[in-house]
Amino acid sequence: MQFHTGLLLAAVLSLQLAAAQALWCHQCTGFGGCSRGSRCPRDSTHCVTTATRVLSNIENLPLVTKMCHTGCPDIPSLGLGPYVSIACCQTSLCNHD
């Protein structure tokens, strides 16, 4: 019985460690920036921030989108146009303003 208890405890601790190491990123969209941290899907490896200049925007603030992603995408893979910048990072909540 003691062996089973130890095995169960090891399994629970392993799950807690995996959850603690999960990547967290800001995931939101807003003009000029935004922040809302949340846990990423298990396969995510990067936090990504895109900034798109909207030519009709009176205040000239970029539309900022923050998300989790598998890898660091390039602009064509996201289907975005020429007025876009992308920044990627790999630590939790690293895609802050």
UniProtKB/Swiss-Prot annotation:
GO terms for cellular component: extracellular space; plasma membrane; synapse. Residues 23-95 form the UPAR/Ly6 domain. Gene3D superfamilies: CD59 (2.10.60.10). PANTHER family: SECRETED LY-6_UPAR DOMAIN-CONTAINING PROTEIN 2, UPAR/LY6 DOMAIN-CONTAINING PROTEIN. Binds and may modulate the functional properties of nicotinic and muscarinic acetylcholine receptors. May regulate keratinocytes proliferation, differentiation and apoptosis. In vitro moderately inhibits ACh-evoked currents of alpha-3:beta-2-containing nAChRs, strongly these of alpha-4:beta-2-containing nAChRs, modulates alpha-7-containing nAChRs, and inhibits nicotine-induced signaling probably implicating alpha-3:beta-4-containing nAChRs. Proposed to act on alpha-3:beta-2 and alpha-7 nAChRs in an orthosteric, and on mAChRs, such as CHRM1 and CHRM3, in an allosteric manner. Interacts with CHRNA3, CHRNA4, CHRNA5, CHRNA7, CHRNB2 and CHRNB4. Interacts with CHRM1 and CHRM3 probably in an allosteric manner. This is Secreted Ly-6/uPAR domain-containing protein 2. It comes from Macaca mulatta. The lineage of its organism: Eukaryota, Metazoa, Chordata, Craniata, Vertebrata. The gene is SLURP2.
